[in-house]
């Protein structure tokens, strides 16, 4: 994220989207980390054949199908993708809050007109009904307030709305601030 205060040129050096190898590798890591895909290949109709070293086309298709079925699991795929795409590709300048904020302090500051800024480079996404920050899926009950975290780089009471009355959201927001992902503007 770059911010300029006057006309400027912008150059991108070396940052590009993932390739197929990156995607497959990352998804395979996710499958292993979450102990998914534990079903074994089986072919109950297999009989002795004349050429024991030959693999039939239908056998390859069944194996390919097993692999593709892993990717077709919508919740697992969404969880992997949200984590993958919000993982930073470069080191962020994260400075956890010192001292840590209490939930009441966060609410009072925001209701008092203070604004939060998102850490530059932090990846925050809304995918379906899920929200991801820095490769982590958020668990909360206030979709509108979480959507505001994804939508705005600077936000306050107006953007967060009724989320500031939701204890689960306030707890989540306070944790994110204390981790250094958002900070109060000076």
List PLM regions with ranges.
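Exposed alpha-helical structural elements
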Residues: 23-26, 62, 144-145, 168, ...
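Helix N-terminus capping/helix-initiation residues
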Residues: 56, 102-103, 156
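Short acidic, hydrophobic short linear motifs in intrinsically disordered regions
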Residues: 144-165
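A conserved active-site cap/scaffold subdomain adjacent to cofactor or substrate pockets
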Residues: 1-76
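Short amphipathic alpha-helical interaction segments
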Residues: 163-178
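Short glycine-rich, low-complexity/disordered patches
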Residues: 40-46, 77-86, 161-163
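Acidic, low-complexity/disordered tracts enriched in E/D and polar residues
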Residues: 69-150, 174, 185-186
């Amino acid at each position: 994220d770059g911010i300029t205060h006057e006309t400027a040129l912008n150059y991108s050096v070396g940052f590009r989207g993932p390739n197929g190898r990156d995607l497959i590798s990352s998804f395979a890591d996710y499958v292993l980390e979450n102990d998914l895909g534990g079903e074994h290949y089986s072919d109950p109709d297999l009989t002795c054949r004349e050429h024991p070293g030959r693999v039939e086309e239908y056998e390859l298709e069944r194996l390919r199908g097993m692999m593709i079925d892993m990717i077709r699991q919508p919740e697992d795929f969404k969880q992997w993708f949200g984590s993958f795409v919000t993982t930073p590709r470069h080191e962020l300048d994260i400075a956890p809050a010192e001292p840590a904020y209490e939930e009441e302090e966060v609410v009072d500051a925001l209701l008092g007109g203070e604004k939060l800024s998102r850490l530059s480079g932090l990846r925050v996404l809304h995918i379906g009904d899920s929200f991801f920050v820095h490769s982590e899926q958020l668990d909360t009950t206030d979709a509108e307030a979480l959507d505001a975290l994804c939508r705005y780089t600077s936000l306050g009471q107006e953007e967060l709305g009724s989320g500031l009355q939701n204890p689960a959201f306030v707890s989540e927001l306070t944790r994110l601030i204390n981790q250094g992902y958002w900070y109060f503007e000076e």
